[in-house]
Amino acid sequence: MRIILHVDLDYFYVQVEEVLKPELKGKPAVVGADPQKGHGRGVVSACNYESRKYGIHSGMPISIAFRKCPDCVFLPVNMDLYVETSVRIMQIFRKHADKFELGGIDECYLDVSKRCKSYKQAEELAVKIKSELKNKEKLTCSIGIGPNKLIAKIAANKQKPNGLTAIKPEQVKEFLQKLSVRDLMGVGPKTEAVLNSINIFTIGQLTKVSEASLAEMLGKFGYTLYLEARGVDESPVEESEEIKSIGRQVTFEKDTGDKKLVLEKLQEIVSDVYKTLREYKFAYKTITIKVRYEDFYTTSKAESLKTPHTDEETAQQKARDLIEAFLLDERKIRLIGFTLSKLS
């Protein structure tokens, strides 16, 4: 019997800031660009539950967040702090797992099938993990327990913040029945709209659609969705694929055609990404540059190296080389992004 835990740190960036600044507790707070000094540029990187009451969410333009809640506390992104905290926390989680998979800076999967012979034992372990996290880091997390990664992740999302939800194999069908199709992994606004257009709103309704019909509508993903709707997920918890990529993007205060400014900002974000890479002790093989122009046209370019690299100099040089073609365009640049991937 497989028993998988999905651990999700609650509103991570803001919660870390609250530990350092206890006066933020109970106040709406956002991590992102300064809405006034930055003239409303940039987006919300993270927000606490108090700010969500005003309709603020991650990815929202900072200008809209400010309009929704002018009294919100807006904090700058402190990625070094978040990475350092994440590294410590993941070491706590890792020691409680038979197998451990990092899903991102604020989430992970734990396969506890060997050390936990029942769901009761798994719940006791989850309580222990939550207690250790609170005592050592003064942070909370939400944990989902299930027979696979899919169910564990959905379960973790059902009780936030500081929740604990366990779904046994025999409870999976009933648990999924009334949930929105959006709760399934990989279902975004576009897929949801396609399903809604044929009156499919819940996972229960989705199970009534044939595999062939889903494949016709959604291609290969249709086959995956057919299985997900039935709670089927055979993917293992994999130690080797902890983080698939590390990246950062920045929106300029004003759309710019200043080549020097773009290159300076690129150098800055490459350094930030490299710090994260170094914290996790990774090597990289692929460098990707992303550019968004003033008309919102977005494009990217990548280069893969023959062997893994660990130095910043190569990353900086390749980033400059890749962005050169984009700088020849007459349009002003709104946003640039940099990502390191194929990590090992």
Where on the chain are the PLM-derived regions?
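Residues that scaffold, gate, or flank divalent-cation-dependent active/transport sites
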Residues: 1-105
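DNA-contacting surface of Y-family translesion DNA polymerases
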Residues: 6, 183, 191-333, 342-343
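Short acidic, glycine/serine/threonine-rich loops at helix termini
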Residues: 16-18, 42-45, 151-159, 197, ...
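Hydrophobic alpha-helical hairpins/lids featuring a short glycine-rich hinge
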Residues: 83-141
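Short Gly/Ser/Thr- and Asp/Glu-enriched loop/turn motifs at secondary-structure junctions
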Residues: 103-107, 146-149, 282-286, 331-335
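Long, highly charged, low-complexity intrinsically disordered interaction regions
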Residues: 120-179
